């Protein structure tokens, strides 16, 4: 059994819209609705949205097809996940944690991630892609044998690490028990005090828990939309698929 948590509490100031970011229209539907549809198409029916800014407006727009958890203060992606109650269903399931602003993600990619996670019996599996454009995402660091050794947020990366084009964009699946067991080990960022979920990768690797990365071909599936220009770019990418 798998459960999905979508991080949708952001305000989306750069969108320059009067709407909360998750419900900004994209190709005729709210951004987060595309992600919900992809999960349902992949057979994942138990979906929780973590909401914050404009929470009631988001609930009214998306409706009762998903569950809701409030993040009253936005203190990072790991902090958002910590707002979800640790139910036995969560602890005994595989738990997707996806950002709620990447509407090009497909059901096939979701199924591919889940299949690899189950097949390898990993504690954590996440999506990556080779990005031909420079974006401010975490770098996936591997050793000379190609083994995953770390994921480094862009602002903490060295000049050499910044050259890495394999990027991580916060599309995870976890064993539920391992996710919640390790969340409390994440320390606040020294710069802004936020709790980053990407830090759980290093924590798990240090404990010799199995962490897997699944690289997909189309990096555009992983791109988060933050500005009106991003919306235009993503709509053009969607039309080119048809």
Residue ranges and their predicted role:
Residues 1-17:
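N-terminal nucleotide-binding beta1-loop-alpha1 segment
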Residues 1, 192-242:
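Left-handed beta-helix
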Residues 105-191, 200, 209, 214-216:
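Conserved core of the sugar-phosphate nucleotidyltransferase
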Residues 29-100, 104-110, 115, 119:
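Conserved N-terminal catalytic core of the sugar/cofactor nucleotidyltransferase
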Residues 2-6, 32, 46-49, 227:
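Hydrophobic targeting segments
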